[in-house]
Amino acid sequence: MSFSGKKFRSRRQQLVYEASLAGRYKKALSKHPFLFFGLPFCATIVLGSFWLSSFTAIKYEQGDRKVQEINEEDILKIRKNQREFDIKEEYYRLQGLSEEDWEPVRVARLKDESENVW
């Protein structure tokens, strides 16, 4: 035997509950569940989507501000400021050969610092 979820109320308490807003809503909800629960839920979802669309529009407007058309003068300035291209230089830069001009040097230890030899 299990306990039911229904709260025990005296006759007087039950009449007061049924006259309250919560009691009337529960009674109407049991008769027409879609009208009193499903429809407001769906309306909240749809209206929330419209309300939040303004926030997503801001995101796309900021992206549009970043992307602009470039006129011919700007293109000429960009091309003028470019560094010269040499295929051999790019090859060596990509190979990282210029970064191999270093020598590993051990850092001097502090006094009383162990060697950490395993």
Curated annotation (Swiss-Prot):
It comes from the Eukaryota. It is a single-pass membrane protein. It is found in: Mitochondrion inner membrane. GO terms for biological process: mitochondrial cytochrome c oxidase assembly. The keyword Transmembrane applies. Present with 672 molecules/cell in log phase SD medium. This is Cytochrome c oxidase assembly protein COX16, mitochondrial. It comes from Saccharomyces cerevisiae (strain ATCC 204508 / S288c) (Baker's yeast).
